[in-house]
A protein has these predicted regions:
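Sec-dependent signal peptide recognition
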Residues: 1-9
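Formylglycine-dependent sulfatase
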Residues: 3, 14-312
């Protein structure tokens, strides 16, 4: 996690020195290392997410915290979560100390426009709110869980707004508008997706593809697996992959893909018992399956295509 934060700070330092790449950060919520076709899952295809590894670098042994808020806080600051005051995921334990600075603060100081579109989970009130942490624009929700994924009420810069559609599609729309609006200036676009975190809810067209799908790869302890929950997770990730593809297509359309760093990872292990590379553990566990995450970084011309990083 400190390595990932260091990469961001190096990019920010380059911006201060004159080189100003855009930065797009895509964060999955409760996706396991094994939830991607790139990592051997044969039950779904994630071509757009996989392309980030194929066209950039993938980190084979990247580790995060076993639950949401600590990982997010460490990523935002490059510091260990307990030093930030983050000791849990609710009742105020998810909040970072007000004195902490985030990478959004640093990018903003370097002249970037900054936006976040999705789940925050590091404090809801000022001075813990995203707008107090270096972000110019916020669409999403600040809590760790949202009960409705269709036509959900979402916050836009302090005002609650009723959205229309599936939450991942809606928030991707907002991120695309942000990129389009700021195409002529350097931007930091942080998209912490809400899926595959529960509630297990997905658009009908995605569910139709997976509702009767035989599961050919199962959890280490198959009796603990709920097949329909796994099928819904697969559908949610297929939807997420499609939205990643929309973001990548927008960068290409605007001729920004060679000037943009794109990062993808997950905040912890899988939220249910399902295939995860045959690793023991899931979300909430410090076993490998609970803390090992995918990490893909694409920066054309700077990162060698297909590079593999084996170091922890």
């Amino acid at each position: 996690m400190r390595l990932l934060s260091t990469i961001l700070l190096l990019a920010c330092g380059g911006a201060m020195a004159g080189e100003r790449p855009n930065v797009v950060i895509l964060l999955a919520d409760d996706a396991g290392w094994g939830d991607y076709s790139f990592n051997g899952n044969r039950q779904l295809a994630t071509p757009h997410i996989d392309s980030l590894a194929q066209d950039g670098a993938h980190f084979a042994r990247f580790f995060v915290q076993p639950v949401c808020s600590p990982t997010r806080a460490e990523f935002l600051t490059g510091r260990y979560h307990r030093r930030l005051g983050v000791t849990g995921v609710s009742t105020g334990q998810e909040r970072m100390n007000p004195s902490e600075k985030t990478f959004a603060d640093s990018f903003k100081a370097a002249g970037y426009i900054t936006g976040i579109f999705g789940k925050w989970h590091n404090g809801s009130q000022w001075p813990y709110h995203p707008l107090a942490r270096g972000f110019d624009t916020f669409w999403g929700y600040t809590s760790g869980h949202w009960g409705e994924y269709f036509d959900a009420p979402l916050e836009h810069n302090g005002v609650m707004v009723k959205s229309e559609g599936y939450i991942v599609d809606v928030l991707t729309d907002k991120a695309l508008q942000f990129i389009e609006r700021n195409k002529a200036r350097p931007f930091l676009c942080y998209v912490p997706f809400t899926t595959p975190h529960s509630p297990f809810s997905v658009p009908p067209q995605d569910w139709e593809r997976y509702k009767d799908k035989p599961l050919i790869q199962t959890a280490v302890l198959p009796k603990e697996e709920n097949p329909d929950a796994t099928r819904c997770v697969l559908a949610m990730l297929a939807n997420q992959d499609r939205n990643v593809g929309r973001i990548l297509a927008k960068l290409k359309e605007l001729d920004l893909e060679n000037d943009t760093i794109v990062i993808y990872f997950s905040d912890n292990g899988p939220n249910t018992a399902r295939w995860n590379g045959n690793m023991k553990g899931k979300k909430g566990s410090v076993d490998e399956g609970g803390v090992r995450s995918p990490l893909f970084i694409r920066w054309p011309g700077k990162i060698t295509r297909g590079a593999k990083v084996d170091a922890i």
